[in-house]
């Protein structure tokens, strides 16, 4: 009986060691999965930062040329507005005189299609 009891004890100890090994293996697997997940997350973040930086540089290049274009357009617009204002100042008196002349000098005329009924 003692040998059976000793055999059972050995089996229980072996089962306990096996359970511990399985638990350790599961813990190692969980740690490896967690580490792999963290590494993948870091790679994703690094890739995202690289793409964002690339996008920002391309956007700056595009906006820089567009900024120069808008400055040129604004300058041309200012020149045109100044030209129109100076033209208005030069021709103001002449246009007012012409307008007043047309309003005040009324010349009554009979319309060419009017027929005098006899």
UniProtKB/Swiss-Prot annotation:
Annotated keywords: Cytoplasmic vesicle, Hydrogen ion transport, Ion transport, Membrane, Transport
Keyword Glycosyltransferase belongs to the record: no
GO CC, alphabetical: clathrin-coated vesicle membrane; melanosome; synaptic vesicle membrane; vacuolar proton-transporting V-type ATPase, V1 domain
Region span, Disordered: 26-90
Superkingdom field: Eukaryota
Entry annotated with the keyword Ion transport: yes
GO annotation (BP), single: synaptic vesicle lumen acidification
Subcellular location: Melanosome; Cytoplasmic vesicle, Clathrin-coated vesicle membrane
Topological relation to the membrane, as annotated: Peripheral membrane protein
Pfam families: V-ATPase_G (PF03179)
Biased composition (Basic and acidic residues): 35-55
GO MF, one example: ATP hydrolysis activity
Biased composition regions of type Polar residues, renumbered to the chain: 56-69, 78-89
Described function: Subunit of the V1 complex of vacuolar(H+)-ATPase (V-ATPase), a multisubunit enzyme composed of a peripheral complex (V1) that hydrolyzes ATP and a membrane integral complex (V0) that translocates protons. V-ATPase is responsible for acidifying and maintaining the pH of intracellular compartments and in some cell types, is targeted to the plasma membrane, where it is responsible for acidifying the extracellular environment.
Subunit architecture: V-ATPase is a heteromultimeric enzyme made up of two complexes: the ATP-hydrolytic V1 complex and the proton translocation V0 complex. The V1 complex consists of three catalytic AB heterodimers that form a heterohexamer, three peripheral stalks each consisting of EG heterodimers, one central rotor including subunits D and F, and the regulatory subunits C and H. The proton translocation complex V0 consists of the proton transport subunit a, a ring of proteolipid subunits c9c'', rotary subunit d, subunits e and f, and the accessory subunits ATP6AP1/Ac45 and ATP6AP2/PRR.
Family: Belongs to the V-ATPase G subunit family.
Cited NCBIfam families: V_ATP_synt_G
Cited PANTHER family: V-TYPE PROTON ATPASE SUBUNIT G 2, VACUOLAR ATP SYNTHASE SUBUNIT G
Protein name according to UniProt: V-type proton ATPase subunit G 2
Organism of this sequence: Sus scrofa
């Amino acid at each position: 009986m003692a040998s059976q009891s000793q055999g059972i004890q050995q089996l229980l100890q072996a089962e306990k060691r096996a359970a511990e090994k399985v638990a350790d293996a599961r813990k190692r697997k969980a740690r490896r999965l967690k580490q792999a997940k963290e590494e993948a997350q870091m790679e994703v973040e690094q890739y995202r930062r690289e793409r964002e930086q690339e996008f920002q540089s391309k956007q700056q290049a595009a906006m820089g040329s567009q900024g120069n274009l808008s400055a040129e357009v604004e300058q041309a617009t200012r020149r045109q507005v100044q030209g129109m204002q100076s033209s208005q100042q030069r021709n103001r008196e002449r246009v007012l005189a012409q307008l007043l002349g047309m309003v005040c000098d009324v010349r009554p005329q009979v319309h060419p299609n009017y027929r005098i009924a006899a």
